[in-house]
Amino acid sequence: MVKQKSPLTVGVIGTGAIARDQHLPYWRELEEEGRVHIVGLCDIVKARREEEAAKCRAAKTYSDMRKMLSENRFDIIDVCTQNRFHSVATIAGLQAGANVLVEKPMAMNVKECEAMIAAAKKARKKLMVAQHMRFEARAQKLKEVITSGACGEIYTAETKWLRRRGVPGWGKFHIAKESLGGPLIDIGVHMMDLCVWLMGCPKPVAASGKVYRKFGDRKDFFNADWGTPYPPKEFDVEDYATAFVRFEGGLTMQMQVSWAANVHDEIENMYILGDKGGVGINPLGFFSADHDSLNHTTWDWLSAEDGHRREVRHFCECVEQNLPVMVKPEESLRIQKIIDAIYLSSAKNREIVIK
């Protein structure tokens, strides 16, 4: 008879919106399947942590993550805090002997990311940044097409995610010391990660960019239905960013992201271009040409399964079976290097070399 493995023990640090809506539902699903046991939830807001604990089987609640880590043994720690706590919470989890899944962005700067990777290597534990868009069916389909060679030699990518009005009106997304930046660090990190992954994770060598703050700090700013109003004087991040990134081998990427811009409607799009064909997200398809026709194949039947669900289940499986994670921390470090270079480029008005 095969001995039944004990459920993995899971702890979650930070029980705000991202944990409540996109992480904990899937850990509870795994708990119902008998694969994990949610042991502890940590948050500085008592009502928030207790509300989520009530949905679990027997999770204890804590206001201090170090107390939670010292009183329990965890196989997995899921870090869902504000950006500025990602590094310290991740390193604490790794040092306590847990494998760590941490929400994007990886951290506030390259130095913090490097410290997280060093801690994971020292502890010999898994570390993965929650780049859920890689796990979506549409991304998996595009990766399949590119990997098949149908696009030929990939040479450039273009991505944009422009919200007409969509500054997050919850948490502290709009405060630089808490989050680092605005849409570049919030939604730009998703688009850049997906682009670079689809291109085969080339090494970035230089970036130029510009960030703007034109709407978020205005008293007359209309933010549509994006949470509760915030004091305009608190808004000190960008609400629009544009960038051009160069990679080894001559590959390039262009990007535009916004929380607020005077466009017709929200735009989310991406193209990865090769010399034989290209792929895009809206519409989701493969585009090519031969000597007498333009060809395109589109897909609208792909699974609607949430990328967050696939991401959580993937990380659980990696820990269960000692498998490599899809989002390698070194890849996330490269994305952070690009982000840091874009902000520096904007400040200095010149291209920044990425080492």
Task: Give the location of each predicted region.
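Hydrophobic residues in well-ordered beta-strands that form the structural core
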Residues: 102, 127-129, 158, 255, ...
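Rossmann-fold dehydrogenase core element
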Residues: 115-132, 152-157
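Predominantly a Rossmann-like dinucleotide-binding segment in NAD(P)-dependent oxidoreductases
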Residues: 18, 133-234, 349
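N-terminal Rossmann-like dinucleotide-binding module
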Residues: 1-56
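Active-site loop of classical SDR/Rossmann-like NAD(P)-dependent oxidoreductases
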Residues: 18, 47, 281, 301-313
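Beta-loop-alpha module in the N-terminal Rossmann-like domain of NAD(P)-dependent dehydrogenases
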Residues: 56-119
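C-terminal helix-rich "cap/oligomerization" subdomain common to oxidoreductases
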Residues: 1-7, 12-13, 76-78, 114, ...
